[in-house]
Amino acid sequence: MKNNNSSSVSIENHPWKKKPTTLLLFLSLLSISLLLLRLSQDKIILITTTKTTATTGTDHQRSHKSSEDDTCLGRYIYIHNLPSRFNLEIIKDCKSITRPKDKISMCKYLDNSGFGPLIGGKSSDYSPSWYATNQFMLEVIFHEKMKSYECLTRNSSLASAIYVPYYAGLDFRRHLRRRNVAARDAAGKELVKWLKKQPQWKDMSGKNHFLVTGRISRDFRRNSGSRSAWGTNFMLLSESLNLTFLSIERSLTSHNEFAIPYPTYFHPTSTPEILQWQEKIRLTNRTVLFSFAGAQRPSRNQNGVVRTEVIKQCKSSSKTCRFLDCDVNANSCDDPISLMKLFESSTFCLQPPGDSLTRKSVFDSILAGCIPVFFNQGSAYKQYLWHIPKNSSKYSVYITVKELRTGGKNKIEEILRGIPNERVVGMRENVIRLIPKIVYAKPNRNKPDGEILEDSFDVAVKGVLERIEGIRRNEFKTD
């Protein structure tokens, strides 16, 4: 009994019994501590999740948006991470893509994201956005711009198109004079073999894939096994027929090729810079009626005959036509400033075909506000369907071969002089309006919300997406 009583007294006399508030205080502190611990854990989880989202890229964040909020819906593009032998190793070995006759090493042209050396410092008339850009650098330029494309995704299932950054033109340049056709064709065959093994190929058998070639179509359409035959067979491979090709000149009979402009010398950083240039050339004093910059070509085919006649007529109209003979080294046809000054001083710029139907000069002259004069429908009208208007008479002059050869020694001058001045002014303004769509702006171009000016890259990407969406609707319907 004593022990029980003692025990009973002990419990009753315990401090918690004497002071009930002490127990309540202890329990309150314990609850607060547990709550703080939970909040701390939640914060750690929140921080970790935020960091993970940031490192997965913009595409991951956008994938959680509703379709109404996602401005990239239908515009997502996935870039294949190709083995380096298809791009980086080609330009790393830049000496191999330089030909003996090249006045400047191709290594120099790879500077500044493929834009080449700066030329702005040579003349106050040209801003730091002017470069000595080589006509064959489009593959590198397009790849660099694609890396900054606003709707890239690392999730290929979200992509409306798959970009294949293979430098086909530069690769061909390495093997330009090799008589071993197997060596010339090797990379193209290896590429399609690699593509077919990727899960992205299975979705549409490659019909949602596209790539850019910085050379004309003919260079990839060798249909002979002869060692003396020109080019590679890349575009004729069965898998290649499913791809969409963007080339500086397309085959007019091809169903999967689309021509996009040659790169010019101007690569602006912002819309105001483009507008400023347009205003400058509107006010330019044009003292020459027409001009031609180029070299003589053999008269073995009609293209050579046309060019020979154009040069002859320009020389015979020496008071109204300026001829920059690119066969003469002293004329500096490789100097962008010399060419631009010629085109800026001319009302019309003659664009006869040469080695092929198209010329880089077409876009350099448009950049200068000079009205192009064509002698073949395939030099522009049937080529650049996404970039130039269908109504060709609004911005250019077309002279048929028959008119050229049977109209007398000054037929070109006669036709151009006969165009009313009011029409010339309107044509020039239409040419100037084309400028934003024929230049490749810098990859890091300042493009604020509400930007309405599209550059050549923007127009090309839009065209690719629309084409692939059309194929998806027509050939891959799901009920």
Swiss-Prot record:
A GO BP annotation: protein glycosylation
Known tissue expression: Expressed in roots, hypocotyls, cotyledons, leaves, stems and sepals.
Residues with glycosylation annotation: 155, 242, 285, 391
Cytoplasmic face of the membrane: 1-20
Membrane topology note: Single-pass type II membrane protein
InterPro entries on file: Exostosin, Exostosin_GT47
Any one GO CC term of the record: Golgi membrane
Main localisation: Golgi
The protein's Enzyme Commission number: 2.4.1.-
EC supergroup of this enzyme: transferase
Any one GO molecular-function label of the UniProt entry: glycosyltransferase activity
Parts of the chain that traverse the membrane: 21-40
Keywords carried by this UniProt record: Glycoprotein, Glycosyltransferase, Golgi apparatus, Membrane, Signal-anchor, Transferase, Transmembrane, Transmembrane helix
Reported function: Functions in xyloglucan synthesis by adding side chains to the xylosylated glucan backbone. Involved in the galactosylation of hemicellulose xyloglucan.
Protein name, entry field: Probable xyloglucan galactosyltransferase GT15
Annotated source species: Arabidopsis thaliana (Mouse-ear cress)
Lineage summary: Eukaryota, Viridiplantae, Streptophyta, Embryophyta, Tracheophyta
